[in-house]
Amino acid sequence: MTKERVIIIGSGIAGCTAALRLMQDYDVTIITKGHKEQSNSMLAQGGVAAAISKSDTPKKHFSDTFQAGCFHNKVRAVNQLVTCGPIVIQKLINEGMTFDEKDGELSLGLEGAHQLPRILHSGGDQTGKFLTTFLQEKLTKVNWQEQKMAIEIIKHDGRAIGVHCLDKENQLHTYYGEHIILASGGLGQLFPVTTNAATISGDGLALAYRADATLSDMEFIQFHPTLLFLNGRCHGLISEAVRGEGATLIRADGSAIMETVHPLADLAPRDVVAATLFEEIERGNQVFLDITKVAHFEKRFPAITTSLDEHQVPFRETKRIPVHPGAHFLMGGVRTDLNGKTNIPHLYAIGEVANTGVHGANRLASNSLLETLVFGEKVAEYIHTQKNNRIIAPENPPTYQTTMPHLPEKHILQEKIWETLGITRKPEKITEFLHWLETFDYANHTRETAEISHMIITSKLIAESALKRTESLGAHRILKGVTK
């Protein structure tokens, strides 16, 4: 009997986890915009948060997650995240995944807004790379389709049945399946300053929107406080774990920035730290990480050390790393239930593209990799319960616009988005931005036009959500009022 087909859009940890749990019983295809190594998961320097120590409990992890999320989280989703977390971690360890140890015990790090150390790492600051590679090497029964950019989710009789893609020569490819899983990541490349991979430009969010899926909480975008900043440009993430190991944020004169701002000082929630640094920079101050108190920095952070050396940062002499906030993570996204189901039958969303409700208004550090693992498992478990979903693929050409479209240049769009929807927002600027967006067309006949069109759709969704939430909450800071 022919196996049912599962199409997964995205090659990060969420998609690979789902693929691993489905490939024995389903015909699984993973479609990825770039090469399979290109994902935010591969870049993740932090770790995986899980309540696995004797002094920790899921209840404590639940509390920290809710407080960081400004109590905008969904209770059942957070409960699933923190209770399943230790289980999925142990499952991975049993399958051969190795996490860093100290004195024969799992080494647990501390990060912002966690009340105690609970962060597992692998390869120091290379957890995302090690975990993604571990999963991908196990995907022996998966059909990989690399450098295929999804441009449209195909629907028939109200259900998702496939996806249209363009290869790097802009040739059309169509894939049909009984189950379509969006695992395409977030939207960092909407901004000129971001930690995200070059391929992450909100494609999955725009595809879902055009397929009539419900999206929510799009105003909640986390800006990471510390990107390496040199000569007016950012060059990747400096992990929060560096502050967890004792680094402090300082001005050029050496004065501490965070100690009078929040009780947790340098380990305050990311929205607080990012906004504080943004204000410092707006006042003309340079911002640095002082790593004087970080023991064995180069051993603990090998990937960051390599990056600093490549960019000729004299950190060994100065004990300083120049930093700047940048777009990092979307808390909102395609609304799903606890199994990753969207409102469109047979369309699922997992990982950063999804809004499961676990993060609320601001994500707790290292909960993102945990989310990918837990919900990757959950969507696979659910699909295993669904039988006899066979579809007959209809003739369904993509909805091309073949006339010459009117679209902005990518860098101009990025700058506009940063000015309007960055760390601090103003209603009048958002309204002006929405009017500007209305002057452009939609097109998907080439990868370039599709990407810019997806960026326009996604930024419009963010702007509309930001206008509706008239008071600040978590990562959404709008200059009309503040909700504590």
Swiss-Prot record:
EC nos: 1.4.3.16
Swiss-Prot/TrEMBL cofactor(s): FAD
Coiled coil: none
Known role: Catalyzes the oxidation of L-aspartate to iminoaspartate, the first step in the de novo biosynthesis of NAD(+).
Keyword Flavoprotein: yes
Residues with site note (Important in orienting the L-aspartate substrate): 111
Pathway(s) it belongs to: Cofactor biosynthesis; NAD(+) biosynthesis; iminoaspartate from L-aspartate (oxidase route): step 1/1
UniProt family annotation: Belongs to the FAD-dependent oxidoreductase 2 family. NadB subfamily.
Free-text remark on how the cofactor is bound: Binds 1 FAD per subunit.
Signal peptide from the UniProt entry: none
Subcellular location: Cytoplasm
Keyword check for Cytoplasm: yes
Gene name in the database record: nadB
Organism: Listeria innocua serovar 6a (strain ATCC BAA-680 / CLIP 11262)
Name used for this protein in its record: L-aspartate oxidase
InterPro entries: FAD-dep_OxRdtase_2_FAD-bd (IPR003953), FAD/NAD-bd_sf (IPR036188), Fum_R/Succ_DH_flav-like_C_sf (IPR037099), NadB (IPR005288), Succ_DH/fumarate_Rdtase_cat_sf (IPR027477)
